[in-house]
Amino acid sequence: VERYICIHGHFYQPPRENPWLEAIEIQDSAYPYHDWNERITAECYGPNSSSRILDDQQCIVRIVNNYSKISFNFGPTLLSWLEDKSPAVYQAVLAADRLSQSHFSGHGSAIAQVYNHMIMPLANRRDKETQVVWGLRDFEHRFHRKPEGMWLAETAVDLETLDLLAQHGIKFTILATSQARSARRIGSTRWRDVSDGSIDPSMPYRITLPGGRTMTLFFYDGPISRAVAFEGLLNQGEYFASRLAQAFSDARDWPQLVHIATDGETYGHHHKRGEMALSYAIEHIESTGIAKITNYGEFLERHPPFREVRIKENTSWSCVHGVDRWRADCGCNSGMHAGWHQQWRAPLRDSLDWLRDQLASRYQKKGREFFRDSWRARNNYVRVILGRSQETIGAFLATECVRPLNDSERIEALKLLEMQRHAMLMFTSCGWFFDELSGIETVQVIQYAGRALQLSQQLFGDALESQFLDKLAQAKSNLNDRPDGRVVFEDFVRPAMVKLETVGAHYAISSLFENYPAESKVYCFDLNRTDYRLLSAGKMRLALGRAFVRSEIVFESEHVSFGVLHMGDHNVTGGVRQFQGDEAYAALCAEIGEVFERGDLPEVLRIVDRYFGDGSFSLRLLFRDEQRRILRLILNQALEEAEASYRQLFEHYAPMMRFMADLHIPPPRRFQIAAEFTLNSTLRRALEAETIDLDNVYALLDETRRTGIALDTQTLEFAMRGATESLAQKWFAQPDDVALLQSLSDAAGLAAAFPFPVDLSQAQNLFFKLLQDVYPSYSARAAQGEPDPKEWVSAFLNLGDRLRVRVG
């Protein structure tokens, strides 16, 4: 009997972009990374594209792309982020799908996913269809083929959703065994009840849908999947492979498929080095012949279903109550907050359902003015989302609109479609999954609702927001300081809202600290500066200017004027307003310039207040990343002064601290603080320098050991890793350069001197590529006695030892 193994990874992150900026702002909890997408890419998505297989001496013997040997899906919104922010990993995912087709009889391992992880049984049919269409189009755009399968968010399923998948050519999806109701052999008249989860997962099942269409369902092995995700099965790759092999049964007389499904982040993010356990397990299975590694498409072609199934509708893999986790206080939660309720889930769902319906009716009515078919236009809008260019948008509008649109009509049409996009993003499942209404995932979906409301207000001038907030107020929090959804909206959504004037204000403040070109970009906005004047008087600086601000998303633009005054430290004040004409602007510049020159600060502030009125702002208005950057610039001098004081204190008392350390006497806390600050900051700067002074860094490390000073592990590991990666990139671009090769080897040796592990994976990856592509030629020339290749090979072998990569 043939035996097959398929491992499926569901790779997904909740969207984290600010809906007004179309970008993720800095997330402190992800430190030392900018945000959680960046962190999880470093811990999981990247490592799975270049996973290590080690020998018995823990040296790397192979680097493999796990994605090419498993079945996987990536959330479209995550792939969009990877394409922009981590293109090497993104390309590795696409390459893995192409490679998998050579492994699996032409069947690619990637499958599609409903677009933004919406719980499909809780959506209306229109939204279900758009989710499927956008998921398919996104997949085809990226992988250049049609998907055979589609992942349903949380495997939440109903017959209408399956029928839509079948209608759009999807051959299969993956469910949990608990979602099957009954099964039988095709042709039999007797159904067997399997509602207790007892369906045999080792075969595919056909399901006949109400309209007569059919598709295939695979039910993954629950116990092994749970062991991988939660029970430490990834602690050793051999155990993982053994557990998979144990699932086969000699009692079965059909080709058996042992298959599991977990969150892809299990391999590396949730379980450190889980990607290596996965690589080892796959290699072990293949090398021992335990089974054939396959994917669902290949297995289905070879072994079509001979049994059929009926499902339990409105069920999922992560809620024992069906799909109540996304609409009710069912008891499913993270388990981290005993005593908390999730009664907020139902009113949040009701509020967003109400808003969806209100926006849909307005969209349909207004859309008739522009679109041949409003809902078809929404389905096809994914073409614009996948590539926002003048050409793409022009072609889309030419196809979908009843007539050519003028500029203002084009803006309205795009706002309608953006309103609908955010009306779907607000149903992303993560908004209900966790424990608290004011949690970041729930705030994110309410922000999408806020953006949809803002667009509706701009289009229709109606009062939907107040009605929505009345409904949202029924959602009660677990926290006294944010008791309900209305307060959450006012605290987290209202401050995040952006208008074109807000972008102008951001630009104005930033211009005091950065030299912008005449044409620049702030997130998804273009700025064209038409005038700019910077005046200085002592520590004070005054910037006056005007600029056109234009949204890249809806093409709306505004001509604004601004004035901003920096009085030193964090004291920044200014204003922005719609441009009032050349005469008014010239009068402002003349009046405020004269007053500023004579140092009359109170009068400058009065003029700013009089001219800009409600458009006044401060540093608080800056977008988060720029706010941090500017505050760091402002604080630099103070930090340098503080560091100099700490350094002076440390250097004066360092001999005493060493003497106390020799006697095993703990130093006074004040001295220890000075030493920790001085040594850690000096080390960080040394590692971030253009050229690392090796002797200095070794001396600093020796000092920390002698004085017992604790190192800032996260910051210094990140800096040491960055320095090594930078050198590796330079050497990879010039592999013949022996000096660069030696510098990288020195850096790798330095990394080993730190009292904590430094991630050298990027350097190892590049070394391994050159081991395959460049080393053979140098090795052959060195064997013939050529001196330069001999030197290169010697340095290369030394680097291999330090990177723990087996050569030869």
Predicted regions and their residues:
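Acidic, His- and aromatic-enriched active-site or binding-groove loops in soluble protein domains
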Residues: 91-104, 108-109, 133, 145, ...
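Short, well-structured secondary-structure segments
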Residues: 4-9, 13-126, 130-131, 144-152, ...
